[in-house]
Design a protein with these regions (language model features):
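Secretory targeting and sorting signals
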Residues: 4-40
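Signal peptide processing junction and immediate N-terminal pro/mature segment
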Residues: 36-50
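Flexible "cap/lid" subdomain of the alpha/beta-hydrolase fold that forms the substrate-access gate
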Residues: 52-87, 91-94, 118, 122, ...
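Structural cue for short, hydrophobic secondary-structure segments
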Residues: 97-100, 123
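Serine-hydrolase catalytic-loop signature spanning alpha/beta hydrolases and amidase-signature enzymes
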Residues: 102-110, 121
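Recognition helices and adjacent regulatory flanks at domain boundaries
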Residues: 107, 126-129
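Gly/Ala-rich phosphate-binding loop of Rossmann-like dinucleotide-binding domains
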Residues: 113-116
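Sequence contexts marking disulfide-bonded cysteines in secreted/extracellular proteins
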Residues: 355-357
Length: 358
């Protein structure tokens, strides 16, 4: 609802939306530029700093009991794009977590145990990434959403709540739009939609255009020895860079086929933009949408974007966060998600959480 957007009042105003997005990212980019991106290579392409973090995700199995939290289990489920890897734990209504690039399900590991106290948490590796099979095609938001719809149905769920970050925002939107009876609530973290604001960020970092370039351009430019350099540049868009488990994320993209799969999600962006614009009015979201932007990146631009495709949008800014909210400010995300996905009528303990209330 527009009344819950903290008076952003930007519906239909692309100029205002662009200023919100560019202003937030430019402020962060200036900070990045002032310090530079220093990368000292360690073993397997990890930096010395990230190597000290241990690469914990690499110890996790493909199937079986999780190591990071023994109440979770890893599994694989069949879809028409191949097997999809997931990590599942907790009890209660199903809450699906969708990661972005360059991450895997591990990007959610700091918030999963708390969310699992009230929900059955299912964190997927997007098709082609992490431990999921690599599809030959179908990296657009609509096809990926259909595959995850198949996955949760085969796991026995007919209703789910969905929370997506970055690339997971695009997939979560298409899932909620195309399967409105299945997705009862949607939370989206720090990405506007293509066709409604995300393209305004293209000039602010070269990685958007590089990742979208046709094969084999990025594949030839970034080889295994370059992965740490490249991804450490990307992770400098964090406001709290030391909070990011860079080593785990870097190692997940050391395999060339995984990198190509990640690029394929970007190569689908023009198709995603057309898909979103084509259905913005005819298939507006009616389920509640929590649109959370990072203070130092997209801010209320996420809510402004979703207001153009959804009826009930609650705009929230994650204080002190850069792009990776779930790793940089996990406590705030947990508190907000528990309110939004929890029972109706529970009051917010602070003003910053007021728009998170169910």
């Amino acid at each position: 609802m527009s009344s819950r957007l903290v008076d952003a009042r930007v519906r239909g105003s692309r100029l205002t939306l662009k200023r919100m997005i560019v202003g937030g990212i430019t402020a962060l980019a200036v900070t990045i530029g002032s310090v530079g991106v220093a990368v000292a290579h360690g073993e397997n392409g990890a930096t010395d700093a990230t190597a000290a973090r241990g690469g914990h995700a690499q110890r996790e199995p493909v199937v079986g009991r999780a190591i990071f939290d023994r109440t979770f289990r890893h599994g694989l489920v069949h879809t028409d794009g191949g097997k999809v890897h997931y990590v599942k734990g907790g009890s209660g209504p199903a809450l699906v977590l969708l990661h972005g690039w360059p991450e895997t399900w591990w990007g959610w590991h700091l918030v999963m145990p708390e969310l699992a106290k009230t929900h059955t948490v299912i964190a997927f590796d997007l098709p082609g990434l992490g431990y999921s099979a690599i599809p030959r095609d179908g990296y657009d938001q609509k096809t990926t959403a259909a595959r995850l719809h198949q996955a949760v149905n085969r796991l026995g769920y007919r209703e789910v709540k969905v929370m997506g970050h970055d690339m997971g925002v695009l997939v979560g939107y298409a899932w909620a739009r195309d399967y409105p009876r299945e997705v009862t609530r949607l939370a989206v973290l720090d990405s506007p939609l293509l066709g409604f604001g995300l393209e305004d960020a293209y000039p602010l970092s070269f990685h958007f255009k590089l990742n979208m370039a046709p094969s084999p351009v990025p594949e030839k430019i970034v080889d295994n020895s370059d992965v740490a350099t490249y991804l450490n540049y990307v992770f400098e868009f964090a406001a709290v860079p030391d909070a990011i488990d860079r080593d785990s994320h870097i190692r997940a993209y050391l395999h060339p086929a995984r990198r190509s799969a990640g690029y394929n999600y970007y190569r689908a962006w023009p198709e995603n933009a057309e898909d979103t614009k084509a259905h913005a009015e005819s298939k507006r979201l009616t389920e509640p949408v929590l649109a959370m932007g990072a203070e130092f990146v997209f801010g209320l631009g996420v809510a402004a974007s979703f207001e153009q495709v959804a009826e009930d949008v609650r705009g929230v800014v994650a204080p002190g966060a850069g792009h990776w909210i779930q790793e940089e400010t996990p406590e705030f995300l947990i508190d907000c998600a528990n309110l939004f996905f929890g029972p109706e009528g529970v009051p917010a303990p602070t003003e910053s959480l007021s728009s998170c209330v169910a």
